[in-house]
Regions:
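Short alpha-beta junction capping motif
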Residues: 31-36, 76-158, 246
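N-terminal export signals
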Residues: 2-3, 9-26
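Aromatic-Pro/Gly-enriched surface loop or interdomain linker
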Residues: 25-81, 85-88, 104-105
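A conditional alpha-helix N-cap/helix-loop micro-motif detector
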Residues: 43, 72, 128-131, 233
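Catalytic beta-strand/loop cores that center a nucleophilic Ser/Cys/Thr
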Residues: 27-28, 55, 160-248, 253
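Solvent-exposed loop/turn segments at secondary-structure junctions
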Residues: 38-41, 69-70, 88-91, 154-158, ...
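Extracellular ligand-binding/catalytic regions of CAZymes and related secreted enzymes
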Residues: 29-30, 56, 60, 67, ...
């Protein structure tokens, strides 16, 4: 049904108005637009992970980008699905000398950072990237029959915009350090959980305030060692889905590492979720 190709960021062309009067329509689009990657989540593993589970195994093509400004009504026009795996923050002044999100630096023992001449001293600060018009664009896209798959830390984006939060259905409250926990199926009758068993991952166990009806929940994350996070206990919502206007929404919380995205049971969930939000047979 769909071509079996992906482009990492053919969307970069969309940013250049010189290419066409309407850059959002300048190139032939894939089935899904994916905004992925942030300071703490390398876009490469997300692209590799979802290219396998969604494009190669389902035949659903994806245009990937990490450019947040491309999430807008003009870009979304013509896509059938939206996928997001990233947080809501940008760091315009850098990281203030903290390179702990750089895996190679950490793996080599965090050597002293030396620069000659010295780097300018700039204080690190984060800011939300989502603008009101972007949240509105996402809401209108899904209401008009678009499919939305939100993964892992996307709940953090909800903190910046009420329209986006209304679509996603919850907002991030935090997570403990990476640890092992179980993902439990709480609604075995849901189309997305068909053929899926409980499974275990080593991941960030994300906690959030869930805004919608409990009947839409189909996954729960559980730390079976009894480890908690702040006052939130050892369990958290792990996945939910619902119709939204003429479209559909699904959120699932695992996804901090490639090993999580490629857990065999989680692959089943991704397959079922994409089919469900796009109204294909599950």
């Amino acid at each position: 049904m769909f071509a079996n190709t992906t482009r990492r960021s053919v969307l970069a062309a969309l940013a250049g108005a010189a290419l066409a009067p309407f850059p959002g329509k300048a190139v032939r689009k894939a089935t899904a637009f994916a905004l992925v990657g942030d300071r703490y989540h390398n876009s490469d593993y997300v692209r590799i992970g979802l290219t396998r589970t969604i494009t190669k195994e389902l035949g659903v093509t994806i245009d990937f980008t990490d450019e947040t400004s491309l999430l807008n009504a003009e870009t979304l026009d013509g896509y059938k699905a939206l996928i997001i795996l990233r947080d809501g923050m940008l760091w315009p002044d850098g990281y203030g000398g903290d390179e702990s999100s750089n895996a190679a630096w950490v793996a080599t023992g965090r050597p002293k950072l030396v620069s000659d001449p010295p780097l300018p001293q700039v204080r690190a600060r984060s800011e939300y990237w989502m603008k009101p018009e972007q949240g509105k664009a996402v809401r209108q896209f899904v209401e008009a029959s678009g499919a939305a798959l939100f993964l892992h830390n996307t709940t953090n984006v909800s903190l910046a915009d009420p329209d986006f939060r209304h679509v996603l259905g919850g907002a991030y409250t935090g997570h403990p350090p990476i640890r092992t926990f179980k993902v439990k199926v709480t609604n075995p009758d849901h189309p997305i959980t068909q053929g899926v068993r409980d499974f275990v991952v080593t991941d960030e166990q994300h906690y959030m305030n869930y805004d919608k009806d409990p009947k839409f929940l189909f996954l729960q994350t559980v730390n079976e060692d009894g480890l908690t996070y702040q006052s939130y206990g050892a369990t958290a919502p792990g996945g939910w889905s619902y119709d939204y206007g003429k479209g559909r929404v699904c959120y699932m919380s695992p996804g901090h590492m490639l090993t999580d995205l490629w857990n065999p049971e989680y692959i089943k969930l991704q397959h079922n979720a994409v089919r469900w939000i796009m109204r294909q047979n599950v």
